[in-house]
Amino acid sequence: MNEIITALEAKYHPLGMIAYGSYADGTNNLNSDFDALLLTDSGSELHDSSVMSGVELDVWVYPRVKIEAPHDAYEFLQIWDGIIISDETGLLSSLQTEVREYIHSTAAKGREENLQNLNWCRKMLARTERGDFEGRYRRCRLLTDSLEIYCNIVGEYFFGAKKALRYMQQYAPDAATVYDAALSSPTFENLQRWIEILEKNFATRFPDS
């Protein structure tokens, strides 16, 4: 990671840099890319997907005016738990604070919206029984979309699949085991057990339902 940071500093001479993703939190593996946001004094906004030190980059470079101008914090959600490497102007620190405040201020989905999503999962489950082309598509859609629905039901912000899976493994290992079984062998029975996990968490969080 340090070698890549040094190379990026030499290439872009940034005013600041914040690393996020797997290299920043120590979960990187052989196929991980290096995620970072760089702030420059001038120039154009660009995305660097080149390879440095054998690692593919996923680096966004922004001129400072991009951050100084009115912007949507949602656009920078990925830096919420990033590591600030450098920050001459203080703009990256302010941006990260803004992103965190945005996340905390975002209202968690309530009972009715979660119930609608849960009912959608039940409908998708029923449609997987068809066993045809469309049924197999519904199965894939159910497995994908239900991960975010799970996060909503338990009251956690959805930061993407990787963080959601890690959260589940750490805080709800039983649910993770059931979900993994459904991913590994998406039979109707395994999918049904996963939906039952969603139903159980919904009933726990919204006991009046």
Where are the predicted features?
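Catalytic core of pol beta-like nucleotidyltransferases
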Residues: 1-9, 24-31, 39-209
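Short beta-strand->loop micro-motif that forms the acidic, two-metal-ion catalytic signature
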Residues: 36
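Short gly/ser-rich loop at a beta-strand->alpha-helix junction or flexible surface loop bordering the NTP-binding
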Residues: 14-23
